[in-house]
Amino acid sequence: DSADLDVIAGATYSSLGLLAAVKDAAQKAGITLKKVEKKAVKAQVAIPAERNYDVVVVGAGGAGFAAALTAKALGVSVILLEKMPQVGGNSLISGAEMNVAQSWIQKELGIKDSPELHAQDTLKGGDYKGDPAVVETMTHGALPAAEWLKNTVGIRYEPHNLFQFDGNSVKPALIPVGQTGTEYITKLSALAQKEKIPVVTGMKAVALIKNKDGRVVGVSCESNGKKYDFYAKGGIILATGGFGANAAMVKKYNPSLDERFKTTDAPGTTGEALYMAQKAGAELVNMQYIQT
């Protein structure tokens, strides 16, 4: 949907060559790239006076918005915090196709699929290193998630069309209009605004706050050199993504991925929240499997 990466802090100059190549390839493929709806992506609230909520979500990409909107729908107070100047993260710059078994388009096209087949393909594609229970939770939850995105969030998908990745037994992937994550982030951001969910950008989480019993009850943040503490009665949700844009961290956990390897991740994908969670007692697993 867009070749305009100005909404990704720090990406503009380093992406000029990539953007030229993308635009050229798009023209040859007959695809029209549109500008990102910057107003929807950037229109975030100022730092609110309220610091106490039922739920605090850290990270305003696709997962963070989904978590915040779900919390709001359940009737609890929620705030969404994002360290970058704009929302979106990797979700914004992704291809955004979504594998969904038994979708409305598969049924229309007469494609036979199932969550079980989706799980088999996923496990095989990951060299069977994935946890089958977790994979099956994902594949069985894909259709309800896609229906929520379409019916509640208002995501538009290409009609009568699906994509098939290498490793898929059949065509399962829904394609958002524009073929990037812009469709997701602009619509999720707009719905968060409509639901009056405070979304604060430029707010970097630096530490989790525990009470005397060792329970995480808040998150300490920094913005423009000032400290802000946000507290949550129900819990803190970390939706901060991975660390593929942190070369030192990548090399630490997978030495074979040294300085020769670049990344497709958004600039903010640097992994500080993983260490923050670890300091609070979380166990980090599978850190060697990294999106590059």
Regions found by a protein language model. Give the residues of each.
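Active-site- and interface-proximal helix/loop "cap" or "latch" segments in soluble metabolic
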Residues: 1-40
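Beta1/beta-strand and adjacent pyrophosphate-binding region of the FAD-binding site
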Residues: 44-63, 79
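Short glycine/serine/threonine-rich phosphate/pyrophosphate-binding segments
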Residues: 62-67, 246-247
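Gly/Ala-rich phosphate-binding loop of Rossmann-like dinucleotide-binding domains
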Residues: 68, 72
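Glycine-rich FAD pyrophosphate-binding loop
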Residues: 73-93
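Conserved N-terminal/central alpha/beta ligand/cofactor-binding core
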Residues: 86-198, 202-207, 248-256, 290
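Helical element adjacent to the flavin cofactor pocket in flavoenzyme catalytic cores
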Residues: 176-234, 274, 278-280
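Glycine-rich loop(s) and the adjacent beta-strand/alpha-helix scaffold that form part
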Residues: 226, 231-292
